[in-house]
Amino acid sequence: MKRICSIYKSPRKNEMYLYVLKAEGLERVPEALLPFFGTPVHAFDLVLSPERKLAREDIVKVLDNLENQGYHLQMPPAEDEYIEHLPEELLRRNDPV
């Protein structure tokens, strides 16, 4: 089953995205979610199918959420996934002696 999806980014939280069916728009998104998410900013439209791979989301879960609840919320990655931790000697390299 192929679905045309609109993806919106959050102006409040970096790397948080809201997937909705393009034909329905934001009508099934709960009002309680919008203060947390912020005013959705349209990022792009995408054709989704079970064969398609997504970078950080399970396509089957996304399609299921779109069918059953009318939206899918992609949360930002956990901090450990995108922050590089530097070795202690590099952190102290510019400290005064």
UniProtKB/Swiss-Prot annotation:
Chain segments annotated as coiled-coil in the UniProt record: none
InterPro entries to which the protein is assigned, alphabetical: YcgL-like_sf, YcgL_dom
Domain spans labelled YcgL: 3-87
PROSITE patterns per the UniProt record, alphabetical: YCGL
HAMAP family listed in its UniProt record: UPF0745
Protein name: YcgL domain-containing protein PputW619_3899
Organism from which the protein derives: Pseudomonas putida (strain W619)
